[in-house]
């Protein structure tokens, strides 16, 4: 789906969050899981910076996303810092900047959390911890599996099944940042969660 994008700001503190407006879609995932590549793929432009250094981003980056012809943004995309890269095991929230918790817990316009997992590796404890926390605070989420191009067909099906079992979810949306697999499905989830009038085909 063609959209117009605009970088808003990078927030390193809760006081820097933009004023609540359009429905917000938060993108979360372990460091180096392909989060920025996913965001860039669905909007069709390189708005989210990719880094070869996992865990480098320590701000929430906000972007306006607008369909052509719309006077105001349809959504705000929030690119959150990656988690789970610390060498020493810690609690999930201890690895994130302190402002992440109030954003996920208190942000009034947060419509959907996109939890991004790597299908080419076994299910990770940190991903389950995140989903359990989102369940606890009542935030709607969808789990999206990236890096499907690294896994063969049969292995992909097995890995997706194992992810569903380990993460206690009914669906993991397989997604390719290099192709188009999963793009329509993810846009559909965003439209539904945000209450946006969807076109006949989202992508």
Curated annotation (Swiss-Prot):
Coiled coil spans? none
Q: Which residues bind Mg(2+)?
A: 36, 57
Residues binding GTP are 29-36, 55-59, 79-82, 146-149, 175-177
| Annotated GO biological process | division septum assembly
Q: Name one Pfam family in it.
A: MMR_HSR1
Keywords on record: Cell cycle, Cell division, GTP-binding, Magnesium, Metal-binding, Nucleotide-binding, Septation
Q: Which SUPFAM superfamilies match?
A: P-loop containing nucleoside triphosphate hydrolases
**Which Gene Ontology molecular-function terms are recorded?**
GTP binding; metal ion binding
- List, for all copies, the residue spans of the domain called EngB-type G: 21-196
Source organism superkingdom? Bacteria
Cofactors, names only:
Mg(2+)
Entry similarity comment:
Belongs to the TRAFAC class TrmE-Era-EngA-EngB-Septin-like GTPase superfamily. EngB GTPase family.
Described purpose of this protein according to its UniProt entry: Necessary for normal cell division and for the maintenance of normal septation.
Q: Which PANTHER family match?
A: ENGB-TYPE G DOMAIN-CONTAINING PROTEIN, MSS1/TRME-RELATED GTP-BINDING PROTEIN
Official protein name in the record: Probable GTP-binding protein EngB
Q: What gene does the UniProt entry assign to this protein?
A: engB
